[in-house]
């Protein structure tokens, strides 16, 4: 019985491997053909010669973070901890 189980498992894994391999090969073939087709279109001059503002890369960009602190702010974790301590009888923080 052990040999039959191994054979069935081996066949299943072979099918999974085959499907994966053919999927990868098919997607590579599709990708290469679509890229070749787009490069032929660009060589023909069918694409616009004037670059638009959207297609240009930004020359430089940055991220700015603004942090605003409130004077009497209590974090949510501290609120939950105080609520938990009020139910369990533990010492909570005094306001």
From Swiss-Prot:
InterPro entries: SMIM26. Keywords: Membrane, Mitochondrion, Mitochondrion outer membrane, Transmembrane, Transmembrane helix. It comes from the Eukaryota. GO terms for molecular function: protein kinase binding; transmembrane transporter binding. Detected in kidney (at protein level). Disulfide bonds: none annotated. It is a single-pass membrane protein. GO terms for cellular component: mitochondrial outer membrane; mitochondrion. The chain crosses the membrane at residues 13-35. It is found in: Mitochondrion outer membrane. Suppresses clear cell renal cell carcinoma growth and metastatis. In renal cancer cell lines, interaction with SLC25A11 maintains mitochondrial glutathione and enhances mitochondrial metabolism. In renal cancer cell lines, interaction with AGK promotes AGK mitochondrial localization and inactivates AGK-mediated AKT phosphorylation, leading to inhibition of AKT signaling and repression of metastasis. Interacts with AGK and SLC25A11. May play a role in cell viability. Belongs to the SMIM26 family. This is Small integral membrane protein 26.
